[in-house]
Amino acid sequence: MNYADTARVKSVLKNCWFTPVETVEEADIVIFDTCSVRQKSEDKVTGKLKEIPLDKKVWITGCMIQHNMRNQKIMTGKKLPENLKTGNFWGVVLTKEPRIVGLTSEEVKNLKKSDKGELVGINHSFNPLFHNLSQKWKNIELFFRIDDTGFLPLMLQKLGYEVRYDRELTNEYSTIVPEGINSSMNAHNKTAYIPISTGCNQFCAYCIVPFARGLERWFPVEQIVKEAKIHLANGVKEIVLLGQIVNKHPDFLTIVKEVLKLEGLEWLRYTSPYPTYYSDELLALHETEPKLCPHIHIPFQSGSNAVLKKMFRGYSAEQCYTFIDKIRSLKRPISITTDIILWFPWETEEDFQETLKLTEYARFDMIYMWIYSNRPGTFADRKYPDEIPYKVKHQRRSQLNDLLYRISDENNQLEVWAERTMIVNEIAENWDIFGYTDNMKQIILKSSPKTANLEIWMLLPVRITKWMVFKLEGEPLL
């Protein structure tokens, strides 16, 4: 999602006549698009700020900012100004007296293309996170919510920048289409990340997303397809549809079918789905549509009914097994990857064994193991003390890793001599080729006369010739 958010910020700034650059050294302004899912992600921001020269202005946006703005009352116990309560605020400008700047609901409603608007400064008890960061790094100039990207031109005027912006200002993040801006980290990447929704209503006990991104909002089918067309016209080959619960969109099946029809598309993927919102028709498309990648990433989080219930996941372990059976019944082999939260509070040894059992049954190709991170304001933060000893945590992680290594090794053996397609995302100096296959496995093509003419971001057919744990080796079929 951060890739898609960053593309929208870059697009608005480009239309304000700002020029994107590749390195910090070239930049006048460095923008941090932050994540708040785990505390470690927020801690990384502090580490990265140390690397920015003081002559560079710094802006910070993303979930860390949205979460801290939205939940100031939860975290500090201080009364919020009315403007903050209703969400009618667009940024924190760091002047001598830090203040939130924004537009009232009525001003937003009456805003027209020709109206440059006037930002209203509102004094309030300043957020401790913003205060501490801005006191430590004097080059921080602006904090803003990613939802308010459409009002960046007005914020920049308030900061004294000369802004030329001839497009309609919008308070709807989803309507900003990043024309001519690739949504990947590399400007020449052939993958585009397209959000089809934002926010979440699930309120899992551990998850900060509903607090950081708000309640779920679904974007119109026409808008999503329009954005996909723009990316494909710019040379993109792979599209990834994004949503916190991506397949909960009421028109998700229609979106998938419409994008699959678009000229120039080679691969289509989506993340992250939820097991209880899968339709049999969607699964059937994985079997019949060659452009819909043979890979499903499904974040089960645990194999224990007791833990799933404490997490408020809304499904049982038995439903996980049933869903896996449906995937395995398809005639087209599908790679399955998952997320597992380790060390969730009060997870017993019996609970952990149930997760190992699910892993063995599903034969996951990859598990993204997330160490439980306590997030302020969540139900787990308020109700579930973390009482699992460190030694036990370490043992459980090692056990799950050992099991995953064995399963990955066995799964990858079955790939040998299979023919697949891959995307090239790195070419080494010795001309070894690195990339990933349509079923999301890392692959290496060793340097040979056949690889001499390959280019970065190419899609090409390959034959698997060798397996390793978590990696494959192959040769191009050209």
Where are these regions (language model features)?
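Structured core elements
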Residues: 193-195, 240, 269, 295-299, ...
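Terminal RNA-binding accessory module
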Residues: 383-478
